[in-house]
């Protein structure tokens, strides 16, 4: 019969749980490894429940382009350190394959899908939260199909924090598509062109520009003209086709695309944590949180 030290070693290897947690689990289950794993999972889930309200604003972007379709998703953690954890990496890789296969963007439905382990995505997230000690959650998913008259390209930045899918008219110029996707990642446009800009966006920007002009004590008779100029500048910044192409600053993206006889149809750009308000805590609060 294996010694208690050997059992603890086996249990730690199987669950990644801490030494004392493994010791308690074995004591509670009369040194039965299988029951101890179950005990740790049950208690781990209980511990994980304390973390579900934590803000997970770090994480990774995952991309997959295959079979004439592209999938992009964001998985969040509380710190970027976790993104290098082997179990987190394995989970995120398996998850993007699963989502790509099922062609769904509904997070609630995805969380009920089963992974190779037999556990659902939701169960696995809770399990990872328990053993890693940080909230792990799938935040959002997008999915794009490539039709006969279109082409897709993807780009994932080296730190896996920014990912892009871009869809254009049909082209075999893979280098241009790659550069276009990289440009979108770096320049962060909000729209393809001005026709995609909402009236609400323009109205809000006009309000901001007018307030700025008034605060600068510009003559009232010139304010409308100043506002128009600033709106045009904003549209240059937020519309992809109006931006200077990073590969060749002498051209706009539109001019570069026209030279290649390519029409840009749509794009999706994900950046980790965008739109999430991050938690700010002082050192004392962090210590207290660790002691709970």
UniProtKB/Swiss-Prot annotation:
It is found in: Cytoplasm. One of its GO terms (cellular component) is cytoplasm. Gene3D superfamilies: 1.10.286.20, DNA helicase RuvA subunit, C-terminal domain, Elongation factor Ts, dimerisation domain. Coiled coil: none annotated. GO terms for molecular function: translation elongation factor activity. CDD domains: UBA_EF-Ts. Residues 79-82 are annotated as: Involved in Mg(2+) ion dislocation from EF-Tu. Keywords: Cytoplasm, Elongation factor, Protein biosynthesis. Disulfide bonds: none annotated. SUPFAM superfamilies: Elongation factor Ts (EF-Ts), dimerisation domain (SSF54713), UBA-like (SSF46934). Belongs to the EF-Ts family. Associates with the EF-Tu.GDP complex and induces the exchange of GDP to GTP. It remains bound to the aminoacyl-tRNA.EF-Tu.GTP complex up to the GTP hydrolysis stage on the ribosome. HAMAP family: EF_Ts (MF_00050). NCBIfam families: tsf. This is Elongation factor Ts. It comes from Mycoplasmoides gallisepticum (strain R(low / passage 15 / clone 2)) (Mycoplasma gallisepticum). The gene is tsf.
């Amino acid at each position: 019969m294996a010694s208690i030290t050997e059992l603890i070693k086996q249990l730690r290897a199987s669950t990644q749980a801490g030494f004392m947690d493994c010791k308690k689990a074995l004591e509670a289950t009369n040194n039965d490894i299988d029951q101890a794993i179950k005990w740790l999972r049950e208690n781990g889930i209980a511990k994980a429940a304390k973390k579900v309200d934590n803000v997970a604003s770090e994480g990774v972007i995952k991309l997959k382009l295959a079979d004439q379709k592209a999938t992009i998703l964001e998985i969040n953690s509380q710190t970027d350190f976790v993104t290098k954890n082997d179990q987190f990496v394995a989970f995120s890789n398996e998850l993007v394959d699963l989502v790509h296969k099922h062609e769904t963007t509904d997070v609630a439905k995805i969380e009920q899908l089963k992974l190779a382990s037999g556990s659902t995505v939701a169960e696995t997230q809770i399990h990872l939260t328990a053993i890693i000690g940080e909230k792990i959650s799938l935040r959002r998913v997008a999915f794009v199909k490539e039709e006969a008259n279109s082409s897709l390209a993807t780009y994932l930045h080296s730190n896996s924090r920014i990912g892009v899918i871009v869809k254009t008219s049909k082209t075999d110029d893979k280098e241009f598509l790659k550069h276009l996707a990289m440009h979108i990642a770096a320049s962060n446009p909000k729209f393809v062109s001005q026709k995609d800009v909402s009236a609400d966006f323009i109205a809000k920007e006009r309000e901001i520009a007018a307030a700025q002009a008034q605060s600068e004590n510009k003559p009232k008779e010139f304010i409308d003209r100043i506002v128009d100029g600033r709106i045009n500048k904003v549209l240059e910044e937020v519309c992809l086709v109006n931006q200077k192409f990073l590969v060749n600053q002498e051209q706009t993206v539109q001019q570069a695309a026209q030279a290649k006889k390519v029409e840009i149809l749509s794009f999706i750009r994900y950046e980790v944590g965008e739109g999430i308000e991050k938690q700010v805590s002082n050192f004392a609060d962090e210590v207290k949180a660790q002691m709970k």
